[in-house]
Amino acid sequence: VSEETEVVVVGAGQAGVAMSEHLGSQGVPHIVLERHRIAERWRSERWDSLVANGPAWHDRFPGLEFSDVAPDAFASKEQVAEYFVAYAEKIGAPVRTGVEVTSVRRRAGRSGFRVETSQGSIDARFVVAATGPFQRPVFPPIVPDGAVPVQMHSSGYRNPEQLPEGAVLVVGAGSSGVQIADELRRSGRRVFLSVGPHDRPPRQYRGRDFCWWLGVLGRWDAETPPQGAEHVTIAVSGARGGHTVDFRALAADGVELVGMTASYDGGVLRFAPDLATNIAVGDEKYLELLRAADAYVERNGLDLPEEPEAHVLAPDPACVTEPRLELDLAEAGVTSIVWATGFAADYGWLQVDTFDEKGRPVQRRGVSAEPGVYFLGLPWLSRRGSSFIWGVWHDARYVADHIVTRRGYLAYDTTDH
């Protein structure tokens, strides 16, 4: 006999916990199913020294501050995970851990869905997929197995001691790739960093964090991504107290920058001749935000210290002006490649008709093309801020309101009019 509830929420990370708060506050019966522990990916699928990319005053839910992190500091991955555990306890979230959802199907000839799990089946009127975009590590099959002793995705990287002696190539210049490359260099490794197109906002400018600037400039609320920018790599770091990602500074410290990793043949990697362009475009995005911030300060008469030095960029290093286009891995002593090339969503368990030909959810603000199915925690779900901790909280409120409204219509048949 199947258990019954109104809503099954799949996943108890930031999206699932936020969803539970809004459903609970409106009295909607629901269950949150989590195959491991609350916020598991923060605990076991990130490197040891990871901290949040936004300050604690910003990267949180409205209802609870971090108890053990100063507002302008950056929470460690353990502190972030414990924050969500504490939040779930605070709101009394009905989370069941250690329960894996194996399939969700629409029930034949009647409303609602059958949710099959590792601990039996549940019938629900609504299902919220709150598993997020980081399900499946992805990296291009460029370098064959065995070409170097170790190839791993950034989700498997923990610390420098984990890798064999020798040089390391890090592929990907988003927050993960940059922080891992910097940590490896500081541990004494020779490091090559493959840099693609990216955005590198200032960590702080004129005394305020970039999260604040994006807020007052209205950029978190941008509703549709700029053309081609849906998956822009953002290079930002809260490591060591937080600092602006500066590829020139990395190069000056000994990291050798190369372009996009293009191909491999006979022990030699080839890189695209795009490094200077990628650096220049990232610089222009950085400078554009500074100019927008200056205009905002002037227009609103704010008393914030000027910071003209932030506009001054160091000369391009030799690795940019005369880029290396080939790397003989053995000759350079490269024994490890870390692919910081992102993730893909995995909705293999969600067997309903709401995906396009590329397997992407067909949805608007989390409301899917399949009535009763919702998505939460995806980039650009409603706005730029959607994949961030505070952004997903607001998206969850919208989804909960939609569920409550739909419940009202469904209740029409069972009430006196």
Which functions belong to the PLM regions below?
Residues 39-65, 250:
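Redox-cofactor-proximal catalytic regions of oxidoreductases
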Residues 67-71:
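A short acidic, helix-capping loop that chelates divalent metal ions and anchors anionic groups
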